[in-house]
């Protein structure tokens, strides 16, 4: 993968128009211990009036995401760990965006049981770049993965079909899914799941 750090920069650029509370780990700093600790600390600060977002770009495997120190037995951030962190977080809305191969298989770690059911406090949404058996493709020449390309474009207003300045979960899914599917010749299909309403607000893109 050539553009994972560029994916992070592109996503951060959108989010930073809304908040200064953005924490980034890339390259050798993105070890499992550092990633877990950072998520834990940030989530612990969140109040019931907040929304939290976790963005990941890199290699994935059925059941989790690969950190910098990933090996055959350790170094992966698992769905169980993410679910546990979400369960402890008081934020009203929790979202995961992942541009990673096989990321749609994340929920399979629970063998079909959706771990989001244990997260009772607030909405929880996973938006993942590909199905269980699919790789996540990058743009020829960059600068991003196809999922990040359309995710960022959608959050900047492209997904706002009714032009009310609010990007809902349904609008974002429809926009990104169509864009990625077409761009990859139907070889990649983003998936969205969790516990939330289709009308859940993901982002207000008209921030001044």
Label each PLM-derived region with a short phrase.
Residues 1-208:
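Cysteine endopeptidase catalytic domains of the caspase/legumain-like
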């Amino acid at each position: 993968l050539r553009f994972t750090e560029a994916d992070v920069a592109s996503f951060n650029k959108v989010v930073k128009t809304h908040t200064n509370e953005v924490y980034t780990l890339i390259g050798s700093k993105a070890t499992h211990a550092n990633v877990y600790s950072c998520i834990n600390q940030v989530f612990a600060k969140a109040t019931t009036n907040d929304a939290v977002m976790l963005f990941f770009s890199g290699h994935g495997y059925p059941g989790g995401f690969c950190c910098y120190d990933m090996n055959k037995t350790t170094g992966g951030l698992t769905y169980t760990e993410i679910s546990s962190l979400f369960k402890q977080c008081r934020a009203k809305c929790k979202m995961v965006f992942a541009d990673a191969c096989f990321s749609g298989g994340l929920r399979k770690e629970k063998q079909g049981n959706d771990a989001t059911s244990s997260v009772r406090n607030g909405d929880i949404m996973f938006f993942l770049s590909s199905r269980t058996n699919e790789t996540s493709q990058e743009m020829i020449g960059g600068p991003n993965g196809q999922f990040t390309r359309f995710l960022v474009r959608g959050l900047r207003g492209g997904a706002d079909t009714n032009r009310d300045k609010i990007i809902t979960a349904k609008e974002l899914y429809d926009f990104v899914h169509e864009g990625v599917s077409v761009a990859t010749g139907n070889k990649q299909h983003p998936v969205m799941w969790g516990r939330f309403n289709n009308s859940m607000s993901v982002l207000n893109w008209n921030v001044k």
